[in-house]
């Protein structure tokens, strides 16, 4: 039997991004890709991202998080999921631990993130510094200026999308800025093709963004390893950074996604702050039947 059988989980969402939080502190259990896929496939535990909480690795941190996409792949960052973990570690009776001033320091394979409560159901995450060099994102070939890279969809003389910005927020993003409503583009068809484009050796999150004012952006996201999503916090952060670099906006904006709105600020110290809501939908336990026949 899988050691995950009968483990308790929280079902949450952040601005529409479906999140499952699984607490594995005090154990040596690691989630295998096949187990993550099985959890995602079940109607009771379906997720866009699975946030697995482990004991801290680095002194002074509160927990280590592993982040899984629906296809079982791991990600280095998930802003909406991090807010949900912040809620769980501060408010859930079975998970909460004492924290100073409602603040937590969490670690992922991409680095440290700080979470702070704003209101009962709103949290701010310090997502750290964006990575802007081509080899940090990473891209498969050198681009001296990642504000625009050479990539397009459609005919050479009349492309549907072209010249995206490239940014990493602990995971790679390509952002296409457009003048018309992002909903008018078939991102469900375009997204998977671009996600796996050879220019992105680690694949990429694909966003279509419309700047509607100096401090508002409308955004649609195809999420690497998950597909079309109602919200993606790291994509919102990457989009604000990219738009600011192109002087389309200042250094702060409200980003409207199908699942809700996020407030993003790229501070003068180069850190990106994301503020948004969390919602607890319920809890459950992982059925042993989910893992029957899995070999990991």
Curated annotation (Swiss-Prot):
Coiled coil segments of this chain: none
Location of this chain's protein in the cell: Cytoplasm
Catalytic residues, chain numbering: 78 (proton donor), 232 (proton acceptor)
Primary location recorded for the protein, binned into one broad class: cytoplasm
Keyword tags: Amino-acid biosynthesis, Cytoplasm, Isomerase, Lysine biosynthesis
This protein's record includes keyword Protein biosynthesis: no
EC number per UniProt: 5.1.1.7
Keyword Chaperone: no
InterPro entries named among the record's database cross-references: DAP_epimerase_AS, DAP_epimerase_DapF
Site label Could be important to modulate the pK values of the two catalytic cysteine residues, positions: 173, 223
Transmembrane regions listed in the UniProt entry: none
Metabolic or biological pathway, per its Swiss-Prot or TrEMBL entry: Amino-acid biosynthesis; L-lysine biosynthesis via DAP pathway; DL-2,6-diaminopimelate from LL-2,6-diaminopimelate: step 1/1
GO MF, one example: diaminopimelate epimerase activity
GO biological process: lysine biosynthetic process via diaminopimelate
Catalytic activity: (2S,6S)-2,6-diaminopimelate = meso-2,6-diaminopimelate
Record-level GO cellular component terms: cytosol
Residues the entry annotates as binding substrate: 17, 49, 69, 79-80, 171, 205, 223-224, 233-234
Main function: Catalyzes the stereoinversion of LL-2,6-diaminopimelate (L,L-DAP) to meso-diaminopimelate (meso-DAP), a precursor of L-lysine and an essential component of the bacterial peptidoglycan.
Family the UniProt entry places it in: Belongs to the diaminopimelate epimerase family.
PANTHER family given in the database record: DIAMINOPIMELATE EPIMERASE, DIAMINOPIMELATE EPIMERASE, CHLOROPLASTIC
Quaternary assembly: Homodimer.
Protein name: Diaminopimelate epimerase
Gene source species: Methylorubrum populi (strain ATCC BAA-705 / NCIMB 13946 / BJ001)
Gene: dapF
């Amino acid at each position: 039997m899988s050691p995950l059988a009968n483990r308790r989980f929280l079902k949450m969402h952040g601005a529409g991004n479906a999140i499952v939080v699984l607490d594995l502190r005090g154990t040596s259990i690691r989630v295998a890709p096949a187990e993550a896929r099985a959890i995602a496939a079940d109607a009771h535990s379906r997720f866009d991202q699975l946030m697995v909480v482990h004991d801290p690795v680095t002194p002074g941190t509160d927990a280590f998080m592993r982040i899984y996409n629906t296809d079982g792949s791991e990600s280095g960052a998930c802003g909406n999921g991090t807010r949900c973990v912040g809620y769980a570690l501060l408010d859930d009776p079975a998970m909460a631990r004492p924290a100073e001033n409602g603040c937590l320091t969490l670690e992922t394979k991409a680095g440290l993130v700080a979470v702070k409560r704003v209101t009962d159901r709103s949290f701010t995450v310090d997502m750290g510094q964006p990575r802007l060099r081509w080899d940090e994102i990473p891209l498969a070939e050198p681009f001296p200026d990642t504000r625009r890279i050479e990539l397009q969809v459609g005919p050479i003389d009349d492309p549907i999308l072209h010249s995206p910005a490239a940014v990493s927020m602990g995971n790679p993003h390509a952002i296409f800025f457009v003048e018309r409503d992002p909903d008018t583009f078939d991102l469900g068809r375009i997204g998977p093709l671009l996600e796996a484009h050879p220019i992105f050796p680690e694949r990429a999150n694909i966003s279509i963004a419309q700047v509607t004012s100096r401090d508002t952006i409308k955004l649609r996201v195809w999420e690497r390893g998950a597909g079309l999503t109602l919200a993606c916090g790291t994509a919102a952060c990457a989009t604000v950074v990219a738009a600011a670099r192109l002087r389309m906006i200042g250094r702060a904006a409200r980003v409207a996604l199908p699942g809700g709105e996020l407030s993003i600020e790229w501070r003068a110290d180069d850190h990106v702050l994301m503020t948004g809501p969390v919602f607890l939908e319920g809890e459950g336990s992982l059925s042993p039947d989910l893992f029957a026949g899995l070999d990991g």
